[in-house]
């Protein structure tokens, strides 16, 4: 046995050898190809600094950036029956759920919490697209209803961030039932005369668009978000016509009166806080910590004048 071969060489190789580098250290901007360091992106709420492109953001990160000082109290989601239909396609549905829960550390795609934004108490509900495409199922339906019930009980407004591909096909009719159930919860909030603001993020489609995502008092969209019922490719194949440029984008919907405003994620908190002060008749803040963009200020000034 040669001690150089068995001992020295492995030591040298361990020091000089190639080390595994995590794949997610640098994030590529889909629009420009620019590489952005993941820590810089996280600090900037996953908005590319140079282009303003809005990357997808996890529900936990969104709540942390949205609430004052990142402090909030999560609402416990109700427990539901798992996979009552015993659904299976290429993989058992129950196994898919286990995989997503293990990977993301959440039970389903809805996270709700109570906290404050610029001192205003609110309930916020966020859909996480990373969990089965943000699909609406029994668990997410129950979680949304729980958030509305909590807002009513605590007499505070509710802000919902939608991100979904639609109803969860693995739950069939049980998934579709969540559309009218969440609609009833919204009506109860409105009867209590409490504001309901929806923030449409990329993408918001399918049954979610056909229910709670388009029933808010005010609809705000993030820049470049795709919002619609069916996807543009399906529509184009059905009507056999070329769709307008930018069809179903948040900017297109704003231009055609489908939503109220398009606001950068970086200005979302300040914009929503100002809207809630108008709607709840709270006194204005003289010097808010964040400033809104010129477009947002103009839109809100019109609302105040009205």
UniProtKB/Swiss-Prot annotation:
Enzyme Commission (EC) number: 2.1.3.15
Reactions mediated catalytically: N(6)-carboxybiotinyl-L-lysyl-[protein] + acetyl-CoA = N(6)-biotinyl-L-lysyl-[protein] + malonyl-CoA
Biased composition (Low complexity): 287-296
Keywords assigned: ATP-binding, Cytoplasm, Fatty acid biosynthesis, Fatty acid metabolism, Lipid biosynthesis, Lipid metabolism, Nucleotide-binding, Transferase
Annotated InterPro entries: AcCoA_carboxyl_beta, Acetyl_CoA_COase_Trfase_b_su, ClpP/crotonase-like_dom_sf, COA_CT_N
Coiled-coil residue spans: none
Protein name from the UniProt record: Acetyl-coenzyme A carboxylase carboxyl transferase subunit beta
Source organism of this protein record: Bartonella henselae (strain ATCC 49882 / DSM 28221 / CCUG 30454 / Houston 1)
């Amino acid at each position: 046995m040669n001690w150089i071969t068995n001992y020295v060489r492995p030591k040298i190789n361990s020091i000089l050898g190639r080390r595994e580098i995590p794949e997610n250290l640098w994030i590529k901007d889909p629009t420009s190809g620019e590489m952005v360091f993941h820590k810089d992106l996280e600090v900037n709420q996953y908005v590319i600094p140079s282009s303003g492109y809005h990357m997808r953001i996890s529900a936990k990160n969104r709540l942390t950036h949205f609430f004052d000082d990142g402090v909030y109290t999560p609402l416990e989601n109700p427990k539901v029956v798992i996979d009552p239909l015993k659904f299976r396609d290429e993989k058992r549905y129950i196994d898919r759920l286990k995989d997503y829960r293990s990977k993301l550390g959440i039970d389903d795609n809805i996270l709700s919490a109570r906290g404050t934004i610029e001192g205003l108490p609110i309930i916020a509900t966020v859909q996480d697209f990373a969990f089965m495409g943000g699909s609406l199922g029994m668990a997410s339906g129950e979680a949304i209803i729980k958030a509305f019930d909590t807002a009513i009980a605590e007499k505070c407004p509710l802000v919902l961030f939608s991100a979904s591909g639609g109803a969860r096909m693995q739950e069939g009719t049980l998934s579709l039932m969540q559309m009218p159930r969440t609609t009833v919860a919204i009506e109860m909030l409105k009867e209590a005369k409490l504001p309901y603001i929806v923030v449409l993020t990329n993408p918001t489609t399918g049954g979610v668009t056909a229910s709670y995502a388009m029933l808010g008092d005010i609809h705000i969209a993030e820049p470049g978000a795709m919002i619609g019922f069916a996807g543009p490719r399906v529509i184009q194949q059905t009507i056999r016509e070329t769709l307008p440029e930018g069809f179903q984008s948040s900017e297109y919907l704003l231009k055609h009166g489908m939503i109220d405003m398009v606001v950068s994620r970086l200005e979302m908190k300040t914009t929503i806080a100002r809207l809630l002060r108008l709607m709840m008749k709270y006194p204005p803040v003289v010097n808010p910590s964040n400033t809104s963009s010129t477009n947002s200020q103009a839109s809100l000034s019109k609302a105040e004048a009205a």
